[in-house]
């Protein structure tokens, strides 16, 4: 796609989703305009096996725009990244058509595993500011991820996801494996401990009742 064809498409995308734009020419002032344009060039090189050239383009673009899109990611038409600073899209991420991302969004992996390790977003998904979607699973079409949410598992189509899974955890966990997902959950651990104690108490009560009956 030539520059002017891209420009016309991007103007339409921005006008559809950002009321702040007043004139078409403003599109070139959006960081996402250049981030996505350069991603398309880098992705083509990446597919041709010219990995170093592709990575060089993506890293230079990340420094200039604050948006890091790995050239290996697969992205459909109509991606809109509003504001954009701090957005990260990983190597094996797959994005459908008409995706909207806000600043601070991470579409990341869960550690050092190989193969598909980043999320798949189907058509018309919106991911709010600061949301983190980590792992190899699918966010169903027409779903919305609320700002600040942390998503670690599959989301069905036409869903709304709200909330942060992060809780304070006092258990020591090794950080050298780069695993962001398989971390002991303090609330779940506490519930299990209480359940185990409850089971023991019931057993003690049953023993006492049996002795009384004797």
Which residues does each predicted region cover?
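Structural signal for interior beta-strand "rungs" in well-ordered beta-sheet cores
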Residues: 62-169
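Terminal amphipathic alpha-helical/low-complexity segments used for targeting or macromolecular assembly
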Residues: 1-65, 175-214
């Amino acid at each position: 796609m030539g520059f002017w064809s891209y420009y016309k498409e991007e103007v339409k995308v921005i006008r559809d989703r950002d009321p702040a734009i007043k004139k078409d020419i403003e599109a070139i002032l959006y960081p996402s305009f250049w981030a996505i344009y350069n991603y398309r060039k880098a992705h083509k090189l990446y597919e041709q096996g010219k990995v170093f050239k592709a990575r060089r383009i993506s890293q230079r673009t990340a420094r200039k725009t604050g948006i890091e899109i790995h050239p290996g990611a697969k992205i459909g038409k109509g991606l809109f990244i509003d504001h954009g600073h701090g957005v990260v899209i990983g190597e094996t991420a797959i994005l459908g058509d008409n995706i909207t991302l806000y600043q601070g969004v991470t579409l990341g992996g869960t550690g050092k595993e190989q193969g598909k390790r980043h999320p798949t977003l189907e058509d018309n998904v919106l991911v709010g500011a600061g949301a983190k979607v980590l792992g190899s699973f699918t966010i169903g079409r027409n779903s919305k991820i609320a700002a600040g949410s942390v998503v670690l598992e599959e989301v069905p189509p036409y869903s709304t996801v709200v909330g942060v899974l992060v809780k304070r955890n006092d258990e020591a966990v090794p950080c050298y494996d780069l695993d962001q997902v398989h971390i002991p959950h303090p609330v779940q651990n506490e519930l299990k401990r209480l359940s185990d104690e409850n089971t023991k108490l019931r057993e003690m009560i049953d023993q006492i009742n049996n002795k009384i009956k004797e």
